[in-house]
């Protein structure tokens, strides 16, 4: 586990890279969802959490806690455990396991790509803090975007219409 300090400049770079990567990952995820929507029915897996929790509680449990816990586990432990098979393999495997831990085919591509991003940020900075900050930044963009860019906060999570429409060629 690389608990090295991270410079302010690296923090800023991590946040900027994450913000710039977000629309690209969203587009790729949308393309994937658009393709599989023809054969797979999507779930409403997050709707209850939105409707039964306060926004601040949701921010805590969707942004802060996963950022810390998931990054310590996936980048701090899994990535480093499989490093003996080569760094690229370890990055891909830890990213695959990270994506699978998100429980659903409709939520596979984005976490997989984010896992690769998080692992590379850790590699570049030498610190677990980089993927934690990136993960938090990504999650808060997603939550705030869902809250402020849609009329109905829970509707974005009760269907995958936004992600599918972003990836739709129509």
Model-derived regions: residue spans:
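Gram-positive cell-envelope targeting signals
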Residues: 1, 12-28, 56, 76-82, ...
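Juxtamembrane helix-boundary/capping and inter-helix hinge elements in multi-pass membrane proteins
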Residues: 6, 37-38, 82-88, 126
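Function-critical hydrophobic alpha-helical transmembrane segments in multi-pass membrane proteins
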Residues: 44-108
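Juxtamembrane helix-loop-helix connectors linking adjacent transmembrane helices
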Residues: 2-69
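Membrane-water interface at transmembrane helix exits
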Residues: 25, 29, 33, 69-70, ...
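Functionally important transmembrane alpha-helices
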Residues: 100, 107-169
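Residue-level signature of the transmembrane alpha-helical core
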Residues: 11, 15, 19, 59-64, ...
């Amino acid at each position: 586990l690389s608990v090295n300090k991270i410079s302010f400049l690296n923090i800023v770079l991590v946040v900027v890279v994450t913000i710039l990567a977000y629309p690209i990952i969203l587009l790729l995820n949308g393309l994937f969802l658009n393709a599989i929507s023809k054969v797979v029915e999507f779930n409403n897996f997050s709707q209850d959490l939105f409707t039964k929790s306060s926004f601040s509680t949701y921010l805590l449990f969707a942004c802060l806690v996963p950022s810390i816990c998931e990054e310590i586990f996936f980048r701090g432990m899994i990535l480093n455990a499989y490093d003996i098979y080569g760094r690229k393999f370890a990055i891909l495997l830890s990213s695959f396991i990270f994506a699978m831990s998100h429980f659903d085919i409709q939520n596979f591509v984005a976490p997989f790509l984010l896992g690769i991003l998080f692992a590379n940020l850790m590699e570049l900075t030498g610190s677990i803090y980089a993927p934690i900050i990136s993960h938090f930044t990504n999650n808060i963009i997603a939550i705030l975007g869902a809250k402020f860019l849609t009329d109905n906060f829970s509707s974005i999570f009760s269907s995958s219409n936004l992600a599918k429409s972003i990836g739709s060629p129509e």
